[in-house]
Each structure stands twice: as C-alpha cells, then as structure tokens.
A protein has these predicted regions:
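Structural signature of multi-pass alpha-helical membrane transport proteins
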Residues: 2-72, 80, 222-281
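Alpha-helical membrane segments and immediately flanking helix-loop junctions
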Residues: 126-174, 335, 339-352
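Juxtamembrane and boundary regions of transmembrane helices in multi-pass small-molecule transporters
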Residues: 2, 6, 115-130, 168-211, ...
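Entry/N-cap segments of selected transmembrane alpha helices
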Residues: 93-119, 173, 283-284, 289, ...
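Structural signal for the N-terminal portions of transmembrane helices
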Residues: 14, 22-27, 76-77, 100-109, ...
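Transmembrane helix-loop junctions at the membrane interface of multipass transporters and ion channels
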Residues: 64-68, 92-93, 125-127, 145-167, ...
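C-terminal ends of transmembrane helices
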Residues: 29-42, 87-98, 122-123, 263-279, ...
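Membrane-interface segments at loop-to-transmembrane junctions
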Residues: 42-46, 69-73, 96-110, 133-139, ...
Length: 352
C-alpha cells in the first residue's frame, strides 16, 4: 500500500517524490487528456485542451510534482512545440509575403492590436494585475506560446513565477475555444450567409488541393532539430536594449527557437544542410511538446484553481476573456469581408 501511495502521491526522495512518481503523473495526465480529447460536447471538441483540464484536476487533489521540474518540462515542451511549427511553415514563410501574404499578415496584426487594446482597457478599468490579465488574454486567444513567453519574461524580471498568470490562462482557455468557434459561425451566417454543408465542402476541396501529402522518407532527421533548438535558446537568451524600456528585451524560449527553425528550414538547403523532417516526426514532436506544456500549466494552476473559480474572481475572468476573444474576431471578420474582400475559408484561417 505504501508503494502505491508513494508512486501516486510522492515520497521523500530525488526531485521531491521520486522519478517513478513524476513519470506516472505526467504520463497519466497526458494519456487521460488525449483520450478525453477525442470526445465531442455538443459537436465541439476541445482536443489537446483536455490535457490542461486533467492537469488542473490532478493538482487540485494534490497529485502534482516538484515546481522546479514543472517549470523545466513546461519550457521544454514549449520549445519543442514552437520549433516544430517553425519547421513546418519555414519553407513557404517568406514567399507568402509576395503572394498576398502581406495583406493577410496586416489583418492578423490588426486583430492582435485590437485584442491588446481590449486587454489594456480591462486592466485599467478593473484593476486586475498585469500578470492575471496577461494570462487571461493568452487563454482567450488560445495563444500557448504567448503564455510561455510572458511567463519567462516575468521570471527574468522578478525571479518569481506568476501562478495567477497560469490560472487566468486556464480559466479563459475553454471559453476562448468556444467563443472563437461561435464567432466563426456568426461570421459565416451573418456576413457570408454560407451554410454548414457548403463550408464543409469548401474545406474538403481545400484539403484535396493542398494534398495533405506524406513525405517519402521514413527516417526522421533529428540533427537539424536539436542543433536548431540549441541555437534558438542562445538567440532567445540574448538581451536586446530598446529605447524607452528600462529592462532589456529577450526573444525568450518561444521566440528564439521559432525564428531559428523558420530560418533553418528556409535557407538550410542553400548551405547543403538537410533540414527535411518527415511530417509524422514533426507532428509527433509538436504533439509531445504541446502535451507537456499544457500538463505543466495545469499542474501549476490547479492548486488554487477551484478556489479562484468558485470563491474568487474566476467568473469575472471568464467574462473578460470572452470580450478579448469575441471583439477582435468580429472586428477582423468585418474588415476581412467588407474591406479586404476575403473569402470565408481564407478569413477564418487568418482569424485562427
């Protein structure tokens, strides 16, 4: 019986609970979250977000791991996630600016700016701490790398971890997913007057055009991945002094690896560097990364999550998150439809 308690609840030993305890907690949280992620509620699937919820549930019942290890695994998962994204988008990243991508990126910047303005307005009107409202914004727009970058910046400045940032993210994230989906439905019905069947047919045609091709090679090339991660961490740790900002700015463990992965995947072949990674290997790295990150965010936020939601300002945070989710999406949808004349599928891609 003591063995079972030690494995699940931890015991005095290496890394505050033992290696087996750590691996069991992380593995079960990810496994349960992934199983639940395959289910749909009212036709809506939360996917990998369930990993976050299961992590919160575990931490609420005291099934957690050492906080220093949580911090490490969270950052490592974030690096894997953003680096795999950079490898995927890098080859066509720069060419997209020459084929209408500049307009789409301009709309994306507009949407982000509106979200930031709404967030700043909420901060000053409600006196919510900056750390909390930053977490709410990250969850409301489902911006996982943004949360990681904000947490690292705060840690670099203060030397402390902001648990309320993770709690704000966890509270706002579910409604961020639902609000985004409902906003897309509203845009489809009101602005485009497209039926559900027509939109599904258009998406199917887009998939056929894109091909969703598999790579011919079965051997994943890990060399550029880990060299790029090392270079990205170095780049993200370089302090950059900007006028008007007292604290040097860093790209962090989200920005550095992302930039390096885009550059390596785009320009690596010119220098005879084999940067190709099979789609399956890239997807595996990305899914492991996001699963580790959300697991650790859940374990980090779960200890005070229920108390904040029930007895604290959790319901207000949900309302603020809904505003941050809906207002930028609807504003971007209006501009995209009536100013830029974008079709529905292109617009939803930008809004996502």
């Amino acid at each position: 019986m003591n063995l079972i308690n030690n494995l699940f609840e931890g015991a005095e030993g290496s890394w505050s609970g033992g290696i087996a305890h750590i691996l069991i907690i992380i593995s079960i949280v990810i496994a349960l979250g992934r199983i639940l992620g395959k289910t749909k509620i009212c036709g809506i699937s939360f996917g990998v977000t369930w990993v976050l919820f299961v992590g919160i549930l575990f931490a609420h019942h005291g099934l957690t791991i050492d906080h220093n290890l949580i911090h490490f695994l969270k950052e490592f998962g974030l690096v894997l996630f953003v680096y795999s994204i950079g490898l995927q988008v890098g080859p066509g990243f720069f060419s997209s600016f020459r084929s209408g991508g500049l307009v789409l990126n301009g709309l994306a910047v507009f949407i982000i700016a509106v979200g930031v303005l709404v967030t700043v307005g909420i901060h000053f009107l409600s006196d919510i701490p900056v750390t909390t409202v930053t977490g709410i914004m990250s969850g409301a727009v489902t911006n996982t790398p943004g949360l990681g970058a904000a947490q690292q910046t705060y840690f670099d400045i203060t030397g402390n971890t902001a648990n309320d940032m993770a709690q704000g993210y966890a509270v706002a994230y579910p409604l961020g997913v639902i609000g985004c989906i409902l906003s897309f439905i509203l845009i489809r019905i009101v602005l485009y007057r497209v039926s559900g069947a027509e939109s599904r047919s258009a998406v199917h045609n887009e998939r056929k055009t894109a091909g969703e091709l598999r790579g011919n090679s079965d051997q994943p090339n890990l060399i550029p991945i880990f060299i790029g991660i090392a270079l990205g961490c170095i780049l993200g740790s370089i302090p950059i002094s900007l006028p008007g900002i007292p604290q040097p700015v860093k790209l962090g463990l989200a920005g550095g690896p992302l930039i390096v992965s885009i550059l390596i995947s785009r320009f690596g072949p010119r220098f005879h560097i084999i940067t190709y990674t099979t789609p399956s290997a890239n997807l595996m790295i990305r899914e492991i990364g996001i699963s580790l990150f959300l697991t650790c965010v859940g374990l980090e936020a779960g200890e005070g999550f229920v108390d904040t939601l029930v007895h604290g300002d959790g319901m207000k945070w949900i309302m603020y998150g809904a505003l941050i989710t809906v207002i930028p999406v609807l504003a971007g949808g209006f501009i995209g439809k009536y100013v830029l004349r974008l079709d529905y599928n292109t617009l939803t891609g930008v809004l996502s």
